[in-house]
């Protein structure tokens, strides 16, 4: 779902769900939160780069299971995405999103 590469002070986070347009499912969001937290805590990292594997950067929130989610589960999913977005907005290092193709909804918010 997510690959993490470190090189010369740059942490690259690559969304790995090309078959779903790199839509933000719960596991991917949690992986991004964890990886970003680690990058921000590492004093040798000066830049965080986000990329999407395949044709699209990120098509937003994964709604494929929306019909099966309770209101509480949907709210939690939205809160976690907002947590990720707030982390990136207030990042102590440079953040770069290399967007291509479709970049919708919460995917556009990553920019």
List the predicted regions and their residue ranges.
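Structured helix-beta-strand junction loops
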Residues: 42, 53, 69, 91-94
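Hydrophobic/aromatic residues within transmembrane alpha-helices
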Residues: 13, 50, 62, 110-111
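Histidine-centered beta-alpha loop that forms part of the nucleotide-sugar donor binding/catalytic region
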Residues: 16, 61, 100
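Glycine-rich beta-to-alpha active-site loop
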Residues: 85-111
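Conserved CoA-thioester-binding segment of acyl-CoA-metabolizing enzymes
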Residues: 1-53, 86
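Residues that form or flank phosphate/diphosphate-binding pockets in enzymes
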Residues: 23, 58, 106
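Glycine- (often His-adjacent) and acidic-residue-rich active-site loop
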Residues: 52-86, 103
